Amino acid sequence: MAQCNLFYQYPITPILEGHVRNILICTEEDIRRLQSQSSLRLREKIDQGHRDKLLRMRLKTELDALQRKMQKDSDVLNSHLKAIEDALLFTNDGEVNVETKADTQLLPKSPERLEKFNQVAITPLDPFIRFTDDFRGEMINTFFNNAQMWNFTFGSWFYKLKRVFYNEPGLRRALKITNVDSLTISKELLTVTVNALEQATVYPIFGSEMSDLEAALCILAAFYSTYENSQIDERTTLVDIITLLPVIFRLLGSEITALKNVSPSGTYFGFNDPSCMKFFVPMRKGKHYAENTFGNHVLVKMLLGRGVMQKIPGEKDSQNFDVEARLHGAIKNDVLVYWTYQLMRPKLGNNVPIFIHDQHYLRSGLVAIESLFLLWRILNSESLFNKRVGKFLLTSIFPQLENVDFAENNFEAGNIQNFEYLMHHYVVPMYNLQNDISISTLFPGLVAVCVNESVRLGWEHKCAGAPSDAVQVQSKENPFVEYIRAQMEQQADVAILEKHDCILFHFENGLNITLSFTLPRQRLFAMASSLFNVNDTYDFIYFLVLGFLPIPAII
C-alpha cells in the first residue's frame, strides 16, 4: 500500500483546513468593526449631501439678490438715459419731428414735463435742445457717448493743441492723448479747451457785480433811449433789451457810418492801453485805466455825441463828475447812470456801479457790444435755407435725429432773421438760467476765431502803436496753450491771471481788427474754415455756440 499512498494522500500538508460549509469564519469583533466603518461612511455621505444642499440654497439666494440689484441698477440707468434723451431731444409745435430709438411716438410736449428742463434752440431748422444745468458740458458728454463707432475731426487748431500737449508727458496723461497721428481728440482735451474759451471774458479774481453782457445792455438801452421813437420805458427789463438788439444795432450802424464819413480813421474799436500792459483790472485804485484809454474808441465817441455820456473816461474834469455822481446819483443829467440804475436795481438794489467811475464795467460792456454787433452783421448776411456746403450735421451729436434737408437751390430770402432767432431762443433762456453769464460763455467760438485772428497778426501790447503798414512776426505760441498749461500745472494765481488776460486782450484786438473791415464775414469765415471746419452760416452758428464743430472723418 505504500506505493499507492500518493493517490489518496495530499501531496502537501494543508495549513488551513476548509470549513465544513465551505465559508470563512468571521468573528463578532470583525463584524462590528465593518458595521462601524460602513456607518461612518454613510454618515459622511449624508452630511456632505446636507452641506451641498445648504451651499446650493445660499448660492441661489445670492444669485437672486444679485439679479435684483442688477435689475434695480439697470432700471436706474435706463431712467437716467431716458431723462437725458428727454432733456436733449423734444419737439414742439411747428418744429421738426424727432423720434427716439425705443419709441416711435413724439416726445411729450406738456408744460408740466418741459418745465423740469432748460431748453434752447440754435437755428430754426433744428428742434429745441433740452439740458439740465451745464448746456455745453452735457452736449460734449452726449457727443462722446454717441460717437464710439466713428472718428471725428475738430479742425486743425484742435489737432495742433493735441500735438503740443502730446510732447508733455504729464499733460498727455491728464488729457488722455494717445494716438498723435489721429485727427480726433479726447473728451478731456476738448472739455479743457472749451472751458478755456468760455472763461475768456470772465474775470477770475476781480469781484464784479454785473457781467459784461449786462453792462453792454445798459449802455445800449441808454443809447436807444436818446431816440424819440424808442420802445423802452421804466418797466423795460434786460430781456427786453436783448429782443430789441436788431433795432438798436441798425441805429448803431447808422451812427458808426456817419462817423466814418466824417473821418475814415474814426472807426477804431480798440483801446489805447499803455505798452506792455499785462492785466485787465484797472491799476489806478482798481477803478480807473490810464488817461486816454477810451479816447479813440468809436463807440465812446458815438455815446458822447448822443449825450449818453458826459465826459470821456480819463479826462481831468471827470474826477469832479465822479464825485458828483457818487453824491447825488446824477440821474437827471446822465443818461447812462439813469438806465443802469433802472435796469440793474432789481438785481443790485441801490448798489449800482457808475461806469465812468468803475471803468472795467465800461470796458467790458463795450467789448460785449462789439461782439453782439459783429454777430448781427454776420449772421443775417446769408439765409440758412440756401443750398448747404458745410459738412456738420446735428446728427453727429444726436444720432436719433432724422436728417431733413430744407435747403433749396437758388433760394432768395427776403427777411433773414438768424440773429433774432438766436437771441430769442438761445441768449434769453441762457440769461434767465444764469444772469451773470458773459459773452465768452455764450459764444466761445467767437472767442476762438477773434483770438486766432489777433495771434495770426502777431499783435502785442508793446506793438499797439506800430505803423499800420508794418508786419509783426508771431513771437509767442498759442495763448490758450499757455493758459491751459498754467491751469493744469497749478501755477501761481498771478501767472494764471496774466495768461488769462493775454487771451482777453487778444479777443479785444481781434474784434477791433474784424470790425474794421467792410465785410467782416469773409474775414471770419476764412479763419474759421481753415481752423475749425466751418464752411457755411449753419456751421458758423453752431461753432459760435458750441466752441467746436465735429465732422466725420475717414481714417
UniProtKB/Swiss-Prot annotation:
One of its GO terms (cellular component) is viral capsid. Residues 1-47 are annotated as: Interaction with major capsid protein/MCP. It is found in: Virion; Host nucleus. Heterodimerizes with CVC1. Interacts with major capsid protein/MCP and triplex capsid protein 1/TRX1 at the pentamer vertices. Interacts with the large tegument protein/LTP. InterPro entries: Herpes_UL25. Keywords: Capsid protein, Host nucleus, Host-virus interaction, Viral genome packaging, Viral penetration into host nucleus, Viral release from host cell, Virion, Virus entry into host cell. It holds the Pfam family Herpes_UL25. The gene is CVC2. It comes from Human herpesvirus 6B (strain Z29). It comes from the Viruses. Belongs to the herpesviridae CVC2 protein family. Capsid vertex-specific component that plays a role during viral DNA encapsidation, assuring correct genome cleavage and presumably stabilizing capsids that contain full-length viral genomes. Participates in the interaction between the capsid and the tegument through interaction with the large tegument protein/LTP. This is Capsid vertex component 2. One of its GO terms (biological process) is viral genome packaging.
